[in-house]
């Protein structure tokens, strides 16, 4: 893909390669995995561990995220540092629910940074920055799918400050529209997509295109 977008932010520009190695068990209810990303310029590097649980329309995900890009302003040289005051990683927990009615497949999710580099300016308290998100498939037919999403962010513990992990103050930080298509190439199917993302708070917008090249 041509960049890496996440919750209203452009994590990386340039050509980005993302990889995902996972194992699913317990009748598809539990998935553990490793997720990595890098860009063509070498200015973006990320390696994460994750756990996903699902049952019915409910889902729970815990991501241990470590972005060790060379230009990072935080600790990006100690992978196994889990000290709250000095770690360069963060733990992100998400509870989600997808309505199972065919005519109303709304997705709702609540994500909170529960540990790591989400501290106040004095590095004395965790802010527990939270991202609340809603997504709805507005079109799905003939191998095409279009999803619209909106997300807001705030800190559960402001710690005397307005800023949080996702922005400068509480508010809408993510509006998106994504079109996905299963492209047929002979005997192969390549999922491709195009996505527009807008951040009203930062007055920024981004466009992303991507494809899933290999799956096994």
Predicted features and spans:
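Transmembrane beta-strand segments of Gram-negative outer membrane beta-barrel proteins
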Residues: 1, 53, 192-194
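Short glycine/proline- and aromatic-enriched beta-strand/turn motifs that initiate or cap beta-hairpins
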Residues: 1-39
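Outer-membrane beta-barrel proteins
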Residues: 5-9, 21, 37-39, 50, ...
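Short, surface-exposed loop/turn motifs at beta-strand boundaries within globular domains
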Residues: 12-14, 44, 127
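Outer-membrane beta-barrel transmembrane domain signature
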Residues: 25, 99-193, 197-202, 207-216
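Surface-exposed loop and membrane-interface regions of Gram-negative outer-membrane beta-barrel proteins
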Residues: 27-83
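Structured domain cores in non-transmembrane regions
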Residues: 70-71, 84, 88, 98-106
